[in-house]
Structure formats: C-alpha cells, structure tokens
Amino acid sequence: SSLEGMQHKYKETVLFFPSNGQTCHAYCTFCFRWPQFVGMDELKFAAKQTKELTTYVEEHSDVTDILITGGDPLVMQTRKLANYIEPILESTRNNINTIRIGTKALGYWPYRFTTDEDAQDLLNLFRKIVSSGRHLSIMAHFNHPAELETDAVKQAIEAIRATGAQIRTQSPLM
C-alpha cells in the first residue's frame, strides 16, 4: 500500500492502524502484531494523518470495507477515533459500506462503552456511522466464554447493540 499505517491486502478491504491505537488492553501470547507494542520501531507501522485514509479510499473505488485495528483503536479517546472516521462519513464518494473496529475493550474494559468519560461520545459515533447507512461491526476479541458473563460486559453489549452496531467475535483456536 502507499499509505503509512495501512495495508490494502484484499481488493475490497483496507486495514488501518491509527497511531494512537498502537497499544492494547492486554498482551495476548498469540498476537502476531506484538512488534508494534514492544518498542521495535523498525517493525511498527501506524498512520498519523487523519485525512489520508479518506483520500486513499476515495481514490480506490474497489475498497468497500475498512477495518480499523491496532493494537486496539478503542484505547484512543473518542474524538481521536472520530478524526479518522468522520471524514469517511462526510466523503462525497459512497464506496465504503462497512466499517469494522477490532477491539479487546469489550472483554478487558467494558466500561469504555458505559461509564468512561467519553463513553456516550463513542456510542454516538457508532450511531452516526449506522445512521449514515453504513454497516458497523465491533470485532470483539474474546478468549473464553467467561469473559462474556460479567454484568459490566452485558451492559456494554446492550449499549453497543442499541446503537445499531453489530458485535462479532473472533478468537484464536489454541
């Protein structure tokens, strides 16, 4: 790809790594992105410019899906995450149908969606994405069913679903 902090591996999908999301809630032993977290600068890649993603997807009309990943993009404050997403929503091009956000926050810090200082701002951003006619998937990373059992996680799931976003889970087979 020609944009720092992005991989255009698949015809319709761009993986985007915002620089403020290059840390995580946990250090999972199976993570294949570990060089990004341990100070190996030559192996890191992250985007610092917020408008470049929009420019790139406008120039590549075959891109219909953006996966915002990291690290974990939900370690960022909502206003920083919105700086990447809102220009896409405001674009005159309508090629982006799906925005996915990969996160471990639902299992490790469900308060991100309920009681954090900017939790309501995050949920409002989710509503804004959905009301723009785009599909929003929160790609929740879980390692064990027990991570779904706490009241805090249940409340977070309810809050996310109320925005119109879908929650999809992914987990490594170990």
Label each PLM-derived region with a short phrase:
Residues 17-35:
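Local cysteine-cluster metal-coordination motifs and their immediate loop/turn environment
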Residues 51-58, 74-174:
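Conserved AdoMet/S-adenosylmethionine-binding subsite of the radical SAM
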Residues 1-16:
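N-terminal [4Fe-4S]-dependent radical SAM core
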Residues 28-31, 72, 81:
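Phosphate-binding glycine-rich loops and their immediate beta-loop-alpha structural context
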Residues 26-30, 39-43, 151-152:
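A short secondary-structure junction signal
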Residues 35-37, 65-74, 104-107:
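Active-site-proximal beta-alpha loop/turn segments in soluble metabolic enzymes
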Residues 34-66, 80-84:
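Conserved alpha-helical substructure of the radical SAM core
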